[in-house]
């Protein structure tokens, strides 16, 4: 999308000192154009607030019926470390900042079969031992 086709307005701005971030509702006006991508919204917000795009997290965008206006939520963290600390893992994964470590198929099967051999509360001990 070319520059200047979408207008971003922020409202309900709040500085959350406890979580070291700025949070706001974003209104994106894009008359006659398709929905604006989240990466473009991130870049424009980063430029507006003079921060790098990697500390800007946008989510929850809904486009109004008939198009032309989308509304969502934006969070701008003070640092990337604080963002990694407070943001949910799925949002970090969308930015490429988190990779879930999944055990191999064989390890999962072995754990499942070990769990079958015990009953009740002992399962948690067997499962915990299998993780380490």
From Swiss-Prot:
InterPro entries: eRP_eS24_sf (IPR053709), Ribosomal_eS24 (IPR001976), Ribosomal_eS24_CS (IPR018098), Ribosomal_uL23/eL15/eS24_sf (IPR012678). Pfam families: Ribosomal_S24e. GO terms for biological process: translation. One of its GO terms (molecular function) is structural constituent of ribosome. Residues 92-132 are annotated as: Disordered. The keyword Coiled coil does not apply. It comes from the Eukaryota. Residues 102-132 have a biased composition (Basic residues). Signal peptide: none annotated. Residues 92-101 have a biased composition (Basic and acidic residues). GO terms for cellular component: ribonucleoprotein complex; ribosome. SUPFAM superfamilies: Ribosomal proteins S24e, L23 and L15e. Gene3D superfamilies: 3.30.70.3370. Belongs to the eukaryotic ribosomal protein eS24 family. This is Small ribosomal subunit protein eS24. It comes from Spodoptera frugiperda.
